[in-house]
Amino acid sequence: MKLSKYIDHTLLKPQATEKDILKLIEEAKTYDFASVCVNPSWVKLAYENLKDTDVKVCTVVGFPLGATSTASKVYETKVAIKDGADEIDMVISVGQLKSGNDEYVKEEIKKIVEASKNKLVKVIIETCLLTEEEKVKACTLSKEAGADYVKTSTGFSTGGAKPEDIKLMRETVGKDMGVKASGGIHTREEMEVMIENGATRIGASCGVELVK
């Protein structure tokens, strides 16, 4: 697979304007990235501009804290799919996970998977807030719930992707599930290290620099 197809070209800053999003979309078309990842309010715009290409539209749910109710996340997912999203990056309920409420976490992911109507679901586990044991548990629950990917980070918390976390996540989910490294990846070398450790998708706001 060519390097550009690993990349979710990402712009999730709250101050991003329509002009910024359109620039992101044009870059994704030019460099043939896997997707653009945008906030839900921009999904329709992205869909309209990408529907005749093979660049997917990715959006976020329960972002960036993961602390909204399951019902809210399900509704967000349904609206995003209706608006044209191909991929959903949902944030896990970190506090519920850390409280040992495994069933809550698993059921929530399962409901998002169901609401996504067979679109790709990536579960952001926010590795920087978890112990090793919790990272393993988050990955296991995500897999059991039927998600397609586990993802390291929102990029809005205390840290981003680390190679050792990617390795652990890959070892936990096995070879048949996707692993997305996201947050703090700024160079091609950093991206290649993530891929070597098991990442099958890279979330980055500097996608153009990564493939130049």
From Swiss-Prot:
GO cellular component: a single term: cytoplasm
InterPro entries xref list: Aldolase_TIM, DeoC, DeoC/FbaB/LacD_aldolase, DeoC_typeI
Disulfide bonds: none
CDD domains, per the entry: DeoC
One GO-annotated biological process of the protein: carbohydrate catabolic process
Pfam families in UniProt: DeoC (PF01791)
Catalytic residues identified in the record: 89, 151, 180
Primary residence: cytoplasm
Molecular-function GO terms, alphabetical: deoxyribose-phosphate aldolase activity
Alphabetically ordered keywords of this record: Cytoplasm, Lyase, Schiff base
Tagged with keyword Lyase: yes
Subcellular location(s) per record: Cytoplasm
Pathway: Carbohydrate degradation; 2-deoxy-D-ribose 1-phosphate degradation; D-glyceraldehyde 3-phosphate and acetaldehyde from 2-deoxy-alpha-D-ribose 1-phosphate: step 2/2
Catalytic activity field: 2-deoxy-D-ribose 5-phosphate = D-glyceraldehyde 3-phosphate + acetaldehyde
EC number: 4.1.2.4
Enzyme category, top tier: lyase
Family: Belongs to the DeoC/FbaB aldolase family. DeoC type 1 subfamily.
UniProt function note: Catalyzes a reversible aldol reaction between acetaldehyde and D-glyceraldehyde 3-phosphate to generate 2-deoxy-D-ribose 5-phosphate.
Protein name stated in the entry: Deoxyribose-phosphate aldolase
Gene: deoC
